[in-house]
């Protein structure tokens, strides 16, 4: 086995060298373990039309695998809903939970490449925090990620991205994500 060191993601290095110290100064924590960090990122793609055509879920699985670098979990309906022609156990979405290095690399690609590619992008809403520092937002189409070949898209799919932090308040979470490069709108 070689003694080569594993390359740390760029955003993770920046967090450890600059951002943690800045957050500690801003909020003056008594313990370094109180400094907020990103715990995980959950990327969810709902495919409601898969209830009528089961092949649609395969396109969502391949798109999400390309975007995140990890095989997504197919989510199935928990109960039947007759109005939607949905039966219990039918696949209706895909989800990926990213942690550690894959999470940091995804956040880096999201903030530096994907979000700037959105047409007429004015920034993320600072009001979508959940009260304890976690942030959730949606993207209208998967083509903003450079891993997706626009010519091979079978249909436009949006996705929900949930950034879970160890922050205890929205202000701490907002400061952490702003320092990581999330472009929030100014009120």
Swiss-Prot record:
It holds the Pfam family Ribosomal_L5_C. The keyword Signal does not apply. GO terms for cellular component: ribonucleoprotein complex; ribosome. GO terms for molecular function: rRNA binding; structural constituent of ribosome; tRNA binding. InterPro entries: Ribosomal_uL5, Ribosomal_uL5_bac-type, Ribosomal_uL5_C, Ribosomal_uL5_dom_sf, Ribosomal_uL5_N. The keyword Ribosomal protein applies. SUPFAM superfamilies: RL5-like. Keywords: Ribonucleoprotein, Ribosomal protein, RNA-binding, rRNA-binding, tRNA-binding. It comes from the Bacteria. GO terms for biological process: translation. Part of the 50S ribosomal subunit; part of the 5S rRNA/L5/L18/L25 subcomplex. Contacts the 5S rRNA and the P site tRNA. Forms a bridge to the 30S subunit in the 70S ribosome. Belongs to the universal ribosomal protein uL5 family. This is one of the proteins that bind and probably mediate the attachment of the 5S RNA into the large ribosomal subunit, where it forms part of the central protuberance. In the 70S ribosome it contacts protein S13 of the 30S subunit (bridge B1b), connecting the 2 subunits; this bridge is implicated in subunit movement. Contacts the P site tRNA; the 5S rRNA and some of its associated proteins might help stabilize positioning of ribosome-bound tRNAs. This is Large ribosomal subunit protein uL5. It comes from Mycobacterium leprae (strain TN).
